[in-house]
């Protein structure tokens, strides 16, 4: 959805067509400009800017130049809420550029303003896939039982590749609430989706059910886990996340027969059930080391990195530490899956990530690894939530605390 850092670097080095020398000079100046802005001292509080400056920044949110759009987002994020929110809401409704509307909607979520919910409800009906994805992601993090009927209606017709998984997660989030007729219908719909449709969408359903500890889907997930196929590892991991130890018999059985690429997910699931966790985590670490030294095991590598990521999200700090320890000195193709897993941990268990980085002796290199993972993630709303948390923590922390220095470093390295 967003350009990755490599694309951004390419954009930053593009100059005019007049000469290679001029192009290179302009590229260097752009890089220096972005690095200087990112590395500058963060303001101690939200700022007030002129209305013209704010409007100009919003208009540049979709600029092709990396430095321009990054600095525009940076200005909007640091503007006082009372000034920024009305202008962002206007942009979401009225901007002619669909990508600018999308970026404005994402930035709006960082201000924690109650009016954001109205903008999200309206965006659910937008023909713009990006806006609908952001809106469903918002309701995942802000579940509203009043939206269940609308979500279920959308479930029967929404087929956009990035939108449907966000819709499923929003429905799974509200289904995790207290039982009631609306929640019951949502749960029935999600269980039905486990065995219906394309594998890509079924995988998203299975993951969401695991993430939201959907005990009600235990039997459906167990049935999928027992079948050889592309969804076996997804279902096994979901059972581990749910935490019902009845799953142990199934997991132990498929551990003996499942193909090698599925083994990391099964080991992770058993660890999540608090059974032989140390040995299973060691297996994941050893698998990463093996895959690093022996090319050709990329699928196994991705599975092991994702397994450590899942353990870290569940609160296993040593798993996050292993991703950093192995990831920092590594090179691609080993490095990318570990940086992606670390970034996922940062989004889904931000307190654990912050605590680890705050006391890590190699913080700078760990944050570089994290930044690479952020560039690969497409969850722009979740990243914005992380950015907002980081800024608030910076503003609220006393000058002399290590946490404030960490926030400053994150803001600079992650270009926000």
Regions found by a protein language model. Give the residues of each.
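Intrinsic disorder/low-complexity segments
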Residues: 1-39, 44
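Intrinsically disordered, low-complexity regions enriched in polar/acidic and amide residues
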Residues: 8, 13-16, 40, 46, ...
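Short N-terminal segments immediately surrounding and downstream of signal-peptide cleavage
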Residues: 42-64
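Alpha-solenoid HEAT/Armadillo-like helical repeat scaffolds in large eukaryotic proteins
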Residues: 56-60, 64, 87-95, 119-127, ...
């Amino acid at each position: 959805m967003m350009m990755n850092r490599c694309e951004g670097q390419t954009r930053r080095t593009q100059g005019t067509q007049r000469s290679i020398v001029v192009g290179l000079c302009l590229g260097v100046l752009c890089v220096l400009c972005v690095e200087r802005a990112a590395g500058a001292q963060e303001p101690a509080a939200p700022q007030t800017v002129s209305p013209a400056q704010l409007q100009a920044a919003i208009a540049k949110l979709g600029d092709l130049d990396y430095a321009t759009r990054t600095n525009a987002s940076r200005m909007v994020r640091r503007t006082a809420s009372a000034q920024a929110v009305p202008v962002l809401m206007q942009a979401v409704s009225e901007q002619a550029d669909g990508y600018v509307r999308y970026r404005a909607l994402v930035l709006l979520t960082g201000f924690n303003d109650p009016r954001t919910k109205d903008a999200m409800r309206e965006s659910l009906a937008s023909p713009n896939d990006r806006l609908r994805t952001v809106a469903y992601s918002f309701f995942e993090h802000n579940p509203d039982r009043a939206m269940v009927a609308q979500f279920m209606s959308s479930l029967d017709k929404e087929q956009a590749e990035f939108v449907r998984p966000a819709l499923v997660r929003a429905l799974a989030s509200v289904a995790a609430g207290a039982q009631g007729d609306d929640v019951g219908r949502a749960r029935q719909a999600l269980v039905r989706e486990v065995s219906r449709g394309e594998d890509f969408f079924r995988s998203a359903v299975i993951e969401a059910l695991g993430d939201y500890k959907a005990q009600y889907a235990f039997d459906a997930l167990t049935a999928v886990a027992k079948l050889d196929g592309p969804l076996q590892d997804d279902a096994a991991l979901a059972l581990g996340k749910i935490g019902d130890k009845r799953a142990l018999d199934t997991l132990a059985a498929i551990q003996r027969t499942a193909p090698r690429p599925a083994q990391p997910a099964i080991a992770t699931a058993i660890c999540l059930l608090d059974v032989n966790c140390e040995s299973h985590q060691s297996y994941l670490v050893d698998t990463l080391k093996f895959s690093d030294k022996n090319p050709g095991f990329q699928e196994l590598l991705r599975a092991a990195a994702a397994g450590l990521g899942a353990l870290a999200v569940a609160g296993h700090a040593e798993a996050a530490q292993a991703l950093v320890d192995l990831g920092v000195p590594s090179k691609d193709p080993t490095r990318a899956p570990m940086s992606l897993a670390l970034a996922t941990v940062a989004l889904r268990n931000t307190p654990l990530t912050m605590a680890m980085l705050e006391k890590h002796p190699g913080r700078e290199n760990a944050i570089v690894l994290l930044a690479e993972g952020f560039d690969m993630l497409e969850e722009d709303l979740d990243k914005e939530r992380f950015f907002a948390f980081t800024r608030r923590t910076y503003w609220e922390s006393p000058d002399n605390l290590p946490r404030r220095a960490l926030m400053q470093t994150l803001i600079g390295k992650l270009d926000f």
